[in-house]
From Swiss-Prot:
Record Gene3D superfamilies: Nitrogenase molybdenum iron protein domain
The protein's name in its UniProt record: Light-independent protochlorophyllide reductase subunit N
Details of cofactor binding: Binds 1 [4Fe-4S] cluster per heterodimer. The cluster is bound at the heterodimer interface by residues from both subunits.
Enzyme class: oxidoreductase
Flavoprotein is among the record's keywords: no
EC number: 1.3.7.7
Reaction equations catalysed: chlorophyllide a + oxidized 2[4Fe-4S]-[ferredoxin] + 2 ADP + 2 phosphate = protochlorophyllide a + reduced 2[4Fe-4S]-[ferredoxin] + 2 ATP + 2 H2O
Amino acid sequence: MSLDLPPPPARGCRSTEVLKERGQREVFCGLTGIIWLHRKMQDAFFLVVGSRTCAHLLQSAAGVMIFAEPRFGTAVLEEKDLAGLADANAELDREVDRLLARRPDIRQLFLVGSCPSEVIKLDLHRAAERLSAHHGPAVRVYNFSGSGIETTFTQGEDACLASIVPTLPATEARELLLVGALPDVVEDQAVSLLTQLGIGPVRCLPAHHAAEAPGVGPNTVFALVQPFLGDTHGALTRRGARHIAAPFPFGHEGTTLWLKAIADEFGVSAETFEAVTAAPRARARKAVAAASEGLRGKSVFFLPDSQLEPSLARFLTRECGMSAVEVGTPFLHRGILGPDLDLIAEGPVLSEGQDVERQLDRVRAARPDLTVCGLGLANPLEAEGFTTKWAIELVFTPVHFYEQAGDLAGLFSRPVRRRAILRREAAE
């Protein structure tokens, strides 16, 4: 069977030496993961133990007024807490008691660490154990850190899911586990394709409700749908589950290779695979070709933001005809991203971590056609004449699998097209 995919490059980037940057960072903290997790996990509540700055970040990022009672909130540490003049643990217990009395629908409560709680060394792990014993079994209390001292942007989801894994029930069943939060419509598309291939049962982490939590054991195999889940990958492996390594499902090639790796694991025939994937694969290829017309032959520079960067570089270079100058990412997990790196032709700089001024110097020297960066860097670069793409949009917009492949290409082509229009208007 031919999947009608281009051959892999003679030499990929898996063994490329990585430039490690350890300087000033410009990136959101891990608290931002709560914005999509609280929508996904419908009987969970995320209680950030932090400052008013944390509360303002969450409220403005989510676009939700706090009186609407979303499934997140902030237990604000006051000056007396920071000065050690109050028993922060006793106050936290009282806040949790009040919250659970007012919101009896909560079945999972996450105590989320922040910069202030890390600075005063508030032991939220012990607090979660204490509160679980008090409020269980109706409510299970977890903890993870979203502190900007310890985490960047998408690491919040990784820390959250990694905190859940040790509590998942044990199972001997042969099951596929999809790991990573996706919009419901995209998750449904993935499960539908896998079901048509005859693969099942398919379980998801995170689950919508605590009662739907998947089991994990030595016969569990898991496929990641997000490349930033290194800690969750490790936690599942320690429970005996086995990872199905594959490129991530961005674009028609990434989606096809991701599905093919799972299909091979479950012994799906080539004929069945072709019958199920041929039509959506063709639609995705056509959509990407149309949306990426203005990208071909252009260069792209990724500043580190979300850990999606290597997978997206593979998509842009393989499916959209771009060339990558530098692929920067906050952390580079070769065990997870190796299959994507294998498909990026040798040449671009791979960098891990951030040193903003040095990386901006390299952007200015390279003069790429498109720079993918965080919100704080985009406007200054635009003022210097660079074309930029906000990296945050690639996290909050549905971009996985066949039906979103054209939309993904469009996210990159729109700023390039906008710049071309502005140049034409300026010349007239």
